[in-house]
Amino acid sequence: MSEQRVVVMGLGNLLWADEGFGVRVAERLYAHYHWPEYVEIVDGGTQGLNLLGYVESASHLLILDAIDYGLEPGTLRTYAGERIPAYLSAKKMSLHQNSFSEVLALADIRGHLPAHIALVGLQPAMLDDYGGSLSELAREQLPAAEQAALAQLAAWGIVPQPANESRCLNYDCLSMENYEGVRLRQYRMTQEEQG
């Protein structure tokens, strides 16, 4: 592959507490910066094998995800190159990680694994709040994860320009601000009805 094509992929389920961390980081990268046309920011969500095309077309792949490495909750790590197989053997928290491991393995078998792969991962603090957003620990790590992703991309020679306007990677109703706002209003209404 002679042309550079960079895929920055946020993985996880937005509706399952810290499981959505990777997608939230991808949203920030999309919202805050303008990228060269050969860089694509992707909400990979929990799409599994549907992500194979993105992976196989990339020369550089940056994965953003919540990963259970058994570390202190809220710990942020960046792994690159030969350290990526550790991602494949980490404790799986959800089906998307099993299927994304399969995506990477299949791309490798087919001879289309990106030449450069890195991962920015967070040890989750909370996963038992289905329908909930990020825990406070995970939310506090969003700026650091954004900076870690930017540092990895800069190591690959990719430096974006700051965006002057706000942009949404997903549907506006799924943005963290809107999702949290609706959830908080619903919670308060429920509390008022009960009390």
UniProtKB/Swiss-Prot annotation:
One annotated GO biological process: protein processing
Family: Belongs to the peptidase A31 family.
Pfam families reported in the protein's UniProt record: HycI (PF01750)
Enzyme Commission code(s) on record: 3.4.23.-
Top-rank EC class of the record's enzyme: hydrolase
Gene responsible for this protein: hyaD
InterPro entries (alphabetical): Pept_A31_hyd_express, Pept_HybD-like_dom_sf, Peptidase_A31
Descriptive protein name: Hydrogenase 1 maturation protease
Cited Gene3D superfamilies: HybD-like
